[in-house]
Amino acid sequence: MQKTYKGKIVLKESVIDGYVTVTDGVISYVGTEKPDGEIFEVAGYIAPGFVDIHCHSCPLAHAKVSPETVAKYHLERGTTTMLLTYYRDIPHERLLECLANTKKAMETNKNIYGAHLEGPYVNPKYGCGTGTDYIPNKANYDKYIEFGVIRQWMCSPEVEGTPEFISDIAKSGIVPAIGHSVASYEQVKTAYDNGARITTHIFDATGAPPTKYGGTLEVNFNESCMLMPEMYYEVICDRNWVHVRKEKLQFLLKVVGIDRVCAITDAYYVGEDTSDDVNFVGTSLTGSKLTMAMVARNLFNAGYTLPEIFKMVALNPSKAIKLMDCGEIAVGNQAKLIEVDESANFKTLLNF
C-alpha cells in the first residue's frame, strides 16, 4: 500500500516544501519532485511522531495499572513510540506482572516499544517515593530480563553492585541509564565504561559528593555525565521550566550539543487537575502532567526551531534506545508521521 503526503516537511536540519511517500509502513521517498499517484495535501507541517522514552502515566491511569490506557492516550496526542516506565517503588512480584502486561499490551498497541525500569537499584536519598530493595539482586533482575521487553534500565552508580549490574544488562541488549544519584566522577566513569549511555532526567534528583576543601565544589553528578562522550541526556521540559531552568538546558546544549539531548515527559500524574503541567505529591516534585505535544510546544516557546525541537522529541530519543529507523523523516525509516502547526502545536496523526 502506498500513500504520498505533500506539505512542509520537518527534516533533521531543515524544513522543505515537498513530498513524503509511504510504502507498506516505510518511508520510500522524501523530496521536492512530485511522485506519481494520488497526493494528500497537508495544511501544516509534516513531522516525525513523538518518541517518549520516560512515561509512567496519563491522566486516566498509571502504566502499572493499565498500559493500554496510557498508550492510547499518548498516541492520540502524537506519541507514536514510547517506553512505559516503572518506578523503583514497585515490589518484585508486582514488577513481574507489569512486565508481563507490557509484553501483552505491545501486541495491540503499536506505539509501545517496550519498558523502561527506573530502579529499583536507586540511592534512597535521591529517589522520591518508597522502596528498600535497592541492592542489585541477579536472581531477580535475570527474571525481568527474560520478558524481552526492557529497553532502558536506570540505576544509581554509587549503589553497591551496580557496576556488575550495568555490565550484565548492557550485554543483554538493554541500554543502561544512570540517575537519582550523588555519584562521583569516578563512579560515573565506571558506569559509562560498563555500558551506561543515558542520564535520567539530568539536573533532577541529583547532587554532588561532599567537598574535600572548604570554599570549593566537587564535580557533581550532572557535570560528570556531561563529560561522557556518547551519553544521551533526558530533560523534562515543562511550561514554566520548573524541573530544568531554561538556562540549564541552554548550558547542556552548549556543552554536549543538540544531538544527544532527549526531551521527555516523565508523566506521573493521574487525575483531573490539569491547571499546571508539573506534579507535586505534598511539597515534593514528582514527575509531570506532560504529553510530548506539550513538551514540543514548550520548546518552541523557549525559542527553538522545528528541526531542533524534533531532534529532541523524536530523533535523539530513538537513537538513545538504539531504535535506528525511527524519529526522522528519511527513506527506510518507519512511517510514523504527525502534523503540527508553525508553533509546534500537535494537530493530528497522519500515518501510523
Regions found by a protein language model. Name each.
Residues 55-58, 68-95, 110-124, 148-158, ...:
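Divalent metal-dependent hydrolysis catalytic cores, especially in the metallo-beta-lactamase
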Residues 43, 117, 169, 199, ...:
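Conserved, mostly hydrophobic/aromatic
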Residues 1-33, 349-351:
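N-terminal metal-binding scaffold of metallo-dependent hydrolase/deaminase domains
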